[in-house]
Design a protein with these regions (language model features):
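Catalytic-site signature of metal-activated, phosphate-bearing donor transferases
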Residues: 71-74, 91-220
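A conserved acidic beta->alpha catalytic loop
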Residues: 23, 38-49, 62, 86-90
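Short beta-strand/loop segment that forms part of the nucleotide-sugar
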Residues: 8, 32-41, 58
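Conserved donor nucleotide-binding strand/loop of the catalytic core
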Residues: 33, 48-68, 72, 76
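Short aromatic/hydrophobic "clamp" motif used to bind/position activated sugar donors
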Residues: 82
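Short, well-formed alpha-helical segments that are part of the catalytic scaffolds
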Residues: 8, 12-27
Length: 355
């Protein structure tokens, strides 16, 4: 088996570190690997905890550049094949044979891991899923961009992107208000610095929208998503889909319901997405176009994949139930509430109707 280096950069991560590193240890115990840990200036017990899992610990002076720290970690690795993980990502599922298969079949490809992002929405824990580039051969790739760094080929050409059987729980959006505020301030300083250099990059507007969304600053979230969508972006690109969905939800949160109806103009480009169809249901629902809302929620349930858990199942059925209940059609509402499983708001709806 070809050994790999798991490269980690960290600063003051004692809160997450035991859970994170033990998740790697448990899932990688039968596969040859090293854990390479780069500390960028911790003042807590981060390095002490890391030393319980690896002897490969290095210091890197923080220079406000995530790619510089990442690339330093690549340079210190013992092996060419690199797996990148962050300390707030806990490995929950991994088949190490997937590494071997990709290395043999796609030696110049990039491995995509599955990330389950946990966050709070309307007071409830929610999850959205994405795939991120994390496994590659350092002979062919490095990192670029000072923030939200990206894997870039060292030479010209387009790399194959391959899903590998590794899933992590990402809890970076689940901190305290103070922790999230500090993280956003750090990130936005770097993003705005990059925006001065490349003012026509829609990806930077997307990331600024993401930052403000994390701290529930709806006005700025809406502004930056909207700026990003002024550019012509391929709907198949994941961040474009996330930006459209985020912009739509921010318009609804700001009660700009009529304005949100312009999403009808991009329906054909994004209707392959359950998340978009669900959003259209919400837009119609908030504009009192209830028949159209029901149709879009039903359309969402016919899509096999979604980013946010429940969008193509119980959340869509629940909203249909709400529409029928408000329309004075309790039997129809009850039918939809009952297929929502143990979703608490649906159970409450069943109890209301039963009274």
């Amino acid at each position: 088996m070809i050994p790999i280096s798991i490269c980690i950069i960290a600063k003051n991560e004692e809160k997450h570190l035991h859970t994170f590193l033990s998740s790697i240890k448990n899932h990688m115990k039968d596969y040859p690997h090293e854990i390479l840990f780069v500390d960028t200036g911790s003042t807590d017990a981060t390095k002490k905890i890391a030393s319980q899992y690896t002897n490969c610990i290095y210091d890197f002076k923080w220079i406000n550049d995530f790619s510089a720290a990442r690339n330093f970690s690549l340079s210190m690795a013992s092996h060419d094949w690199i797996l990148i993980l962050d300390c707030d990502e806990y490995v929950t599922s991994l088949n190490p044979q997937g590494f071997q298969q990709m290395m043999e079949q796609y030696p110049t490809g990039i491995g995509m891991i599955t990330r389950l992002n946990h966050y709070q929405m309307n007071g409830q824990d929610s999850v959205y899923t994405d795939q991120v580039e994390r496994f590659f051969n350092r002979k062919y790739f490095h990192y670029e961009s000072i923030i939200h760094e990206q894997v870039v080929p060292l030479s010209s050409g387009k790399a194959d992107k391959v899903s590998i059987p590794l899933t992590v729980d990402h809890c970076g959006y689940m901190g305290t208000v103070e922790e999230l505020q500090k993280k956003v301030e750090r990130n936005n300083t770097l993003l705005l610095q990059m925006l001065e250099q490349t003012p026509d990059d829609p990806y930077l507007y997307f990331q600024l929208g993401q930052s403000y969304n994390a701290i529930h600053d709806v006005e700025k979230t809406c502004y930056y998503y909207g700026k990003g969508l002024e550019y012509d972006i391929n709907p198949q690109i994941e961040y474009a889909q996330l930006m459209v969905i985020g912009y739509g939800h921010s318009l609804l949160n700001l009660k700009r319901y009529k304005e949100a109806l312009f999403f009808e103009n991009i329906y054909d480009e994004f209707s392959f997405s359950a998340d978009f169809l669900f959003l259209m249901g919400l837009i119609y629902m908030n504009n009192a176009l209830f028949d159209k809302a029901i149709q879009e929620f039903l359309n969402a349930t016919r899509c096999p994949k979604c980013s946010v858990k429940g969008i193509n199942s119980y959340l869509a059925y629940y909203n249909i139930g709400v529409i029928y209940e408000c329309a004075g059609m309790p039997n129809e509402a009850l039918n939809y509430y009952k297929i929502c499983g143990d979703y608490e708001p649906a159970l409450s709806g069943i109890q209301r109707i039963a009274k």
